[in-house]
Design a protein with these regions (language model features):
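Active-site cores that bind ATP or allylic diphosphates and position pyrophosphate for catalysis
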Residues: 104-253, 261-266
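Non-catalytic terminal extensions that flank enzyme cores
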Residues: 1-14, 32, 37, 133-139, ...
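Short, surface-exposed acidic
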Residues: 69-71, 236-239, 273-275
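N-terminal Rossmann-like or analogous alpha/beta NTP/dinucleotide-binding catalytic cores
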Residues: 1-114, 205, 213-217, 221-234
């Protein structure tokens, strides 16, 4: 089977070894199968993404020896498609406005999830407000995020028991979606529209991605994405959640922790051949 895989970084900082490992894993799977490898820039959050980081990550990938099929897809150029999906979900009655502040969200989340941004946390926020309360907050110009109501989604789908995906990892098999672990997750914001979790399922479907290959830190997000795929009548790809690369301190590489970047390694004289060998891709 020819695989269609993708690497979808967010240009919010420079790439590190963890990114290189993930990109090489997806690229190798596609090339060994005679398939296609796609590069997608997940830059929906214009408040944090920077063009210089996109330029740098493309340079890093080329330095690693990676190539991709077709043009680079930038999510910032596809907001119409994502907002259409957001509108469909609103029309279904499965979204509600959440007016909690960033500080409140961070306190509830207890840490930073994907995107290093507490506004994406799935902690329970009390559900939708009454019409009177919501109208008052909107009249005051209070900022809000759109959250997916799991109760409403469950009612519309007749339950989550039938939602599953095929996992091809060290623990392969059919996995049942358990979206309750993340609660009512943020799927959009007033300032940027539809967020990562919607944009990714829309793009995976439109680009014909057969295998989503990414870090195991995102395995819980798959349950929410299965709910969205079911609501939006989108196909379900096969998933491979690979191990996370850990640094000398035993912690996973992360932008927010100042992990050594690929640019810094390159400037220090490390070659792409050496790094690929270190990561297991000799």
């Amino acid at each position: 089977m020819s695989l269609v895989t993708r690497f979808a970084p967010s240009p919010t900082g420079l790439l590190h070894r963890g990114h290189a490992f993930s990109a090489l894993t997806a690229w190798t799977a596609a090339r060994r199968s005679g398939g296609r490898f796609l590069l997608r820039i997940e830059d929906t959050d214009f408040t944090r993404c920077r063009p210089e980081y996109e330029t740098a990550l493309i340079e890093d990938l080329r330095w690693l020896g990676l190539d991709w099929d077709g043009p680079v897809v930038r999510q910032s150029e596809r907001r119409v498609a994502y907002d259409a999906a957001l509108d469909r979900l609103r029309d279904m009655g499965v979204l509600y406005r959440c007016f909690r502040t960033r500080k409140e969200l961070m306190a509830l989340a207890g840490g930073a999830p994907h995107g290093d941004d507490p506004v994406d946390a799935g902690a329970f926020t009390g559900g939708p407000l009454s019409a009177v309360e919501e109208a008052a907050l909107l009249a005051d110009g209070k900022p809000f995020a759109w959250r997916l109501s799991l109760n409403a989604a469950r009612d519309r789908l007749g339950g989550f028991e039938a939602l599953a995906w095929i996992e091809e990892t060290a623990d392969p098999g059919v996995k049942t979606a358990r979206p309750e672990a993340l609660g009512d997750m943020v799927v959009g914001r007033k300032d940027i529209g539809a967020g990562y979790v919607i944009a990714s399922v829309v793009d995976d479907a439109e680009q014909g991605v057969t295998h989503v290959i990414r870090g195991e830190d995102l395995i819980e997000t798959t349950s929410i994405q299965r709910v969205l795929q079911a609501l939006l009548d989108l196909p379900t790809p096969t998933y491979r959640h690979h191990r996370l690369l850990l640094g000398p301190d035993g912690k996973r590489y992360a932008k927010r922790d100042g992990s050594v970047t690929l640019m810094a390694l390159r400037e220090a004289g490390v070659t792409a051949v050496e790094l690929r060998a270190e990561l297991g891709f000799a």
